[in-house]
Amino acid sequence: MRPLVACLCAEWCGSCREYRATFAAFSARYGERCEFAWIDVEDESDALADPDLDNFPTLLIGAGERALFYGAVTPASAERLVAGAVDGSLAPSAGADALELLGRVRRLLEERDGGGAA
């Protein structure tokens, strides 16, 4: 199963809009080895059970049934995290709340894609 990198954002957030090009570049670079999802938490608040985010954008990285990372990071740090998820060197550092959110994100993506989430 490919790792999943979900960017949790909000349409009104200027930082999220600026981050979108960086996220697209990650997808172009790592897309064959990792799944990427851009998720507006306000549009998907019901499916995500209204997650309590401290900062935008927030990355959620998971592999299999493990939540590897959950938090806000700079683009440079995000690239290191994505590379670590892809090569298997990223050690899990996210808690139970991130694991629950990862499950909700996967279900949302399955609904969007008709069962195609990683």
Listing of model-derived features with the role each one plays in the protein:
Residues L8, S27, G31-A47, L53-N55:
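Thiol-based oxidoreductase modules, predominantly thioredoxin-like and allied folds used
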Residues G14, D43, A76:
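Short alpha-helical
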Residues L48-A49, A98:
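Glycine-rich, charge-decorated loop segments at or immediately adjacent to ligand/cofactor-binding or catalytic sites
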Residues N55-E100:
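Non-catalytic, surface beta->alpha helical segment in thiol-disulfide oxidoreductase systems
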